[in-house]
């Protein structure tokens, strides 16, 4: 692998992707640095999940390139990529009666048996899944399944000595109650500060993005229309223009970050 020359973990340049004659992603460039959380936001149909699939290498762009740690993502050996990059999809269903612990253990498959149980125990505790450990995954609520899937991808990236890695999450809080939304994003924020981890997630909740993201990319009909800090992106003019919603903006009483509310 090429040496990492700076803090950039992921660099996407001029990504474009179409289905038939429909342009889904149109000339998008962005970067994600280690030690930060990047949020991708945008209205329904903006192309957020498709962009995430391009960034992770699950699909190939028709134009442009995505580099992970300085190397084109398609050039990474599959097993090495799996130990360095993990993806939590929006929906994950299972047909067979796996226990929660067995689902979490799937994340360790790129590592073999090395440190397997330590990794599983660590991430189950981090994600507040201790009480779910022996339950049938199929019988869990949507929010509980979401926490288990987060534990799985964290297990995939767990190393006894942390290494540079990238975590991609597609709406990781969409099914969670308030406590677990806060618990999850506090955990993810802490991990990016304590480890050389870069994190990129699709979020619909703009207030969570404002509180926890270091950078925000706003997507609209496949185009990147705004990028910057929460302060720079989450303003009245930008949000009204691209979301077409009657909204207002106030300030969080503790952080002074923008907080969005819908008018009655």
Curated annotation (Swiss-Prot):
Annotated ATP binding sites: 42-49
Chief place of localization: membrane
SUPFAM superfamilies, A to Z: P-loop containing nucleoside triphosphate hydrolases
Enzyme Commission code: 7.6.2.-
Pfam annotation, one family: ABC_tran
Membrane association type: Peripheral membrane protein
Keyword field: ATP-binding, Cell inner membrane, Cell membrane, Membrane, Nucleotide-binding, Translocase, Transport
TM annotation in the entry: none
Cellular compartments per GO CC: plasma membrane
Superkingdom of origin organism: Bacteria
GO MF term list: ATP binding; ATP hydrolysis activity
Domain ABC transporter: 10-246
InterPro entries in UniProt: AAA+_ATPase, ABC_transporter-like_ATP-bd, ABC_transporter-like_CS, P-loop_NTPase
Compartments, record wording: Cell inner membrane
Role of this protein: Part of the ABC transporter complex HmuTUV involved in hemin import. Responsible for energy coupling to the transport system.
Family stated for the protein in its record: Belongs to the ABC transporter superfamily. Heme (hemin) importer (TC 3.A.1.14.5) family.
Subunit structure: The complex is composed of two ATP-binding proteins (HmuV), two transmembrane proteins (HmuU) and a solute-binding protein (HmuT).
Protein name per UniProt: Hemin import ATP-binding protein HmuV
Annotated source species: Photorhabdus laumondii subsp. laumondii (strain DSM 15139 / CIP 105565 / TT01) (Photorhabdus luminescens subsp. laumondii)
